Amino acid sequence: GINLMSEPLKATRFGYPCDRIPTSFELYFKYKPGTYAHTGDVFETREGTPDFCAIYAVFFDNVKAKAENPLNIPTLDGSNVFTSSSIIAIANLHTCDNAEYRQWEQGTNGEWKFINIPFKGVDENVDYLTLVDPERLKKQEYSLTIVCCSSYYGDFFEGAIDSELTI
């Protein structure tokens, strides 16, 4: 099993089986970053350090994820949501090509913003759509996870306690 106290990132379960291939991640959001950031387990205050949000979606092969998972479950977790070899494509506000979108991760001035982030294959030299087996897709052997967090490093217990992300 997993020790939740010593391995909190592994306690999460990311991914919902799907039978379609995502090509973009769209949503409306507004974000107000907090003014103080907290770091690690000791919650040291770093005045003036701006927080920023995390908004991303990950499309992955859940059969491969299950084979890689020591608990034999077809999900990703906080320790491998960006690094698992089962990942096929990612749509990430933080790394998207649209500079205007990226600036909104630092705040939207109370305004609702619409984003449409294309998925990018992990291997940029290969069209990720060609990596998906249509028969396996029908059997929901691929999964999608969506993560939205008011602090980009919230999974590491770092961020501002007064940041607000509304989806």
Stretches with model-predicted labels:
Residues F60-I167:
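Terminal, low-complexity interaction segments
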Residues G1-A67:
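Extracellular-facing segments of soluble proteins and assemblies that are Gly/Ser/Thr-biased and enriched
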